[in-house]
Amino acid sequence: MRIAVVGIGGVGGFYGGKLALAYAGKREHDVIFIARGEHLQAIRKKGLCLITPEGETLTVVPTLATDRSEEVGTLDIVLFCTKSYGLEESARMITENVHDGTVVLPLLNGVNITERLRKVLPGCTVLNGCVYIGSNIEGPGVVHHKGGTGQLFFGPDRKEDIEKFRYLEDLLRGAGIKADLVEDVAVQVWTKYIFVSSFAGITSLRGKTFGAVLENDEDRKMLQGLMAEIEAVAKAKGMHLPADIVEESLRKGASFPYATKTSMQLDYEKGRPTEIDIFME
């Protein structure tokens, strides 16, 4: 199969890196990185440097790294790992590379990503998905996985279709990715949204890390309040969430390293565009 990872940032670098380490250069699969700028040039020259939480450095060489759709060829699986504000542009780039059998798996933050992709790629099968990882670009060609288990949840809208995508779960797990094909994927996406939207907002507002926010009573109460508000929105939309979703989200935040920052906080601190649109929608 021909697998493309669109966006080789913190998320795409980790999951794309895992896939390329396992499958690139093998007869059965091609793993293609779609990136841009200095990051792309560095990957082309030296491969992607993926740093693990333990400090180990892995060199990842994909089958192809490019920013040109004409070099990509026909794709069977596409993982979208871009920022939300670049989603449609990135999807339009590969419209000539996908077909009716192409499976698209977005790993972005947000609760409307699948719908947005289906508008641009109506002939593809677009699944829903979310991930838990603390990872970011440290420099051109370098991605550092700092924390989080790397857990990936994904699935189709209809639970009756779940077995059609068991092969994708096997493919991801074969690359050492903690992937679970689930029937309640919308609940998983909202659960992630409650977690990441709240932490992104409060850490960016306060200019603090996960650990610093959680140990401050005022910040923690603000975090809890924001989580409860998003929980209420999810329930109003018909989501059946666990009763302890707020407490579990706080526990999840505490499982990350003290110095963890959200991608929105990192972007805000560096003066780059942020994903505030999806966090405050």
What are these regions (language model features)?
Residues 1, 29, 76, 124, ...:
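Nucleotide donor/acceptor-binding cores
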Residues 1-56:
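NAD(P)+-binding Rossmann beta1-loop-alpha1 motif at the extreme N-terminus of oxidoreductases
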Residues 4, 30-32, 105, 127, ...:
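A structural signal for isolated positions on well-ordered beta-strands in alpha/beta enzyme cores
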Residues 23, 96-97, 119-125, 138-247, ...:
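Internal alpha-helical scaffold of NAD(P)-dependent oxidoreductase catalytic cores
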Residues 35, 54, 67-69, 108, ...:
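Residues at the C-termini of beta-strands that transition into short coil/loop
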Residues 39-42, 114-115, 162:
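Short, charged/polar "capping" segments at the starts of alpha-helices
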Residues 57-142:
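Rossmann-like NAD(P)(H) cofactor-binding subdomain of soluble oxidoreductases
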Residues 235-281:
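C-terminal active-site/capping subdomain that shapes the small-molecule cofactor and substrate pocket
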